[in-house]
Every structure is written in C-alpha cells, then in structure tokens.
Amino acid sequence: MKIGVLALQGAFREHINMLRTLGAEAVEVRKAEELAELSGLIIPGGESTTITKLLYTFGLAKPVKDLARNGMPVWGTCAGMICLAKELSGDISGVKTLELMDITVRRNAFGRQVDSFEAMLKVKALEGGDFPAVFIRAPLVEKTGQWVEVLAKLPDGTMVAVRENNLLATSFHPELSADNRFHRYFVQMAKDYKP
C-alpha cells in the first residue's frame, strides 16, 4: 500500500515523515504518472493559491479528481482543505479548487500568521482523548452538504474537521503534532480502499 503526498509546495515532508513512522510507504507526488498505484493522497497545507494553480499547471487536477470520484481516499490539510472544497467564501481571487467535497470553506478565517494557535479537539473518529491541533492561517468550514460528517469542532462550534465518504479535510495541521492518530486514521482509509 502506497500513500502519496502532493509535493508541489507546502508542508509535504512532515506528512511523509509521519506516514513513514506508521510503516506506510509514502511517496512525493509532482507528476500525474506518480499517482499510479496509490491507495491514498494527501494534499498538504501551504499557500492555497499556489497549490491550486500548480495542480492545474502540472496536469494533476483531472487525474486527482478522477481518482477521488472513483473512491481513492484524499485528505486535505489546511490549504488542502481549500483545494477539496466545492465552494469558497470571502476573498477567493486566484483559487480554482478541485470541487470534490460538498463544503463551503473560508480561507484565512482565523487571521494572519501571528494569529496562529493550538487547540485540543474532541474528534469523533479518534480514540485516546483530545487531539492537539495546530492552526496556522487556517480555513474553516462554513457549510456542509447532506452527506458530510463533521468530525471536530472548536468550542464555539466552528467546524474544523470533516469527512465525506473517501474525502477527509482538516483546517489544522496534524503533521505538525507529535500525535499520529489522524495519520493512522487516514492510513486505515487507504487500507480499506479497493480500486
């Protein structure tokens, strides 16, 4: 089983390292042919305008969409969540998403870099207590479609982790925590995938 991490820009190395600590074969993905034989794909945090532009420039958008629509697990963290969203609100200039997940997302919802924070989250899908979530210029989910499951909210009710079938999205950066439970959860999604 091989899990790819989109390596065009952003925090891809941290995801690779976390996956490898779990014994998963993790590979960097920069070209469409590198999507072959994957059991899952992570779209990391970074700069959403840059990542979405490069997805289309390098011819990755269509094959990623096709694989996701055929059931391959795809997880977007922070900017990756923005990439997966069907709709964006607020300043969306320069961002063309993959329009895969039935969510409306607001970019940079918590402010600038200096407004970054950590929070302990109760996550439905994870056992073992609260999860330490790192938010850096994070988006938030404003609205979900009928089939989207909300996995975690901040104490004020803000949705920050969601799943729709084979699609997973988090506003925060699990790869920047020492806690590997979210990655373990995604590895299990990848193991369950039957192409």
From Swiss-Prot:
It comes from the Bacteria. PROSITE patterns: PDXT_SNO_1, PDXT_SNO_2. GO terms for cellular component: cytosol; glutaminase complex. Belongs to the glutaminase PdxT/SNO family. Keywords: Glutamine amidotransferase, Hydrolase, Lyase, Pyridoxal phosphate. Catalyzes the hydrolysis of glutamine to glutamate and ammonia as part of the biosynthesis of pyridoxal 5'-phosphate. The resulting ammonia molecule is channeled to the active site of PdxS. GO terms for biological process: glutamine catabolic process; pyridoxal phosphate biosynthetic process; pyridoxine metabolic process. In the presence of PdxS, forms a dodecamer of heterodimers. Only shows activity in the heterodimer. It catalyses: aldehydo-D-ribose 5-phosphate + D-glyceraldehyde 3-phosphate + L-glutamine = pyridoxal 5'-phosphate + L-glutamate + phosphate + 3 H2O + H(+); L-glutamine + H2O = L-glutamate + NH4(+). InterPro entries: Class_I_gatase-like, PdxT/SNO, PdxT/SNO_CS. Pathway: Cofactor biosynthesis; pyridoxal 5'-phosphate biosynthesis. Its EC number is 4.3.3.6, 3.5.1.2. SUPFAM superfamilies: Class I glutamine amidotransferase-like. PANTHER family: PYRIDOXAL 5'-PHOSPHATE SYNTHASE SUBUNIT SNO (PTHR31559), PYRIDOXAL 5'-PHOSPHATE SYNTHASE SUBUNIT SNO1-RELATED (PTHR31559:SF0). GO terms for molecular function: glutaminase activity; pyridoxal 5'-phosphate synthase (glutamine hydrolysing) activity. It comes from Dehalococcoides mccartyi (strain ATCC BAA-2266 / KCTC 15142 / 195) (Dehalococcoides ethenogenes (strain 195)). This is Pyridoxal 5'-phosphate synthase subunit PdxT. The active site is at residues 78, 173, 175. L-glutamine binds at residues 46-48, 107, 136-137.
